[in-house]
Amino acid sequence: MDRDTFDSAIRTFKHRTPFQPFTIAMVNGVRLEVDYPDALAVRDGAALYFAPGGIPVLFDYEGVSQVAGDLAERH
């Protein structure tokens, strides 16, 4: 994913009103399920995600393959 698409997609999903959970799919197969908007901070193509339990995950646009929809729709 390119840097501009990454920044735009993350910000769009993070700031939806009302907030809806979304998934960030990494190129290595890891999936980050963002269920709270403040669990994710984004700046200049890099992001910090706080996974359940407060575990920090640092990643950038080069490691992301897709940012996708609403987790609730898949249950």
Where are these regions (language model features)?
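Motif-centric detector for short Cys/His coordination patterns
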Residues: 1-75
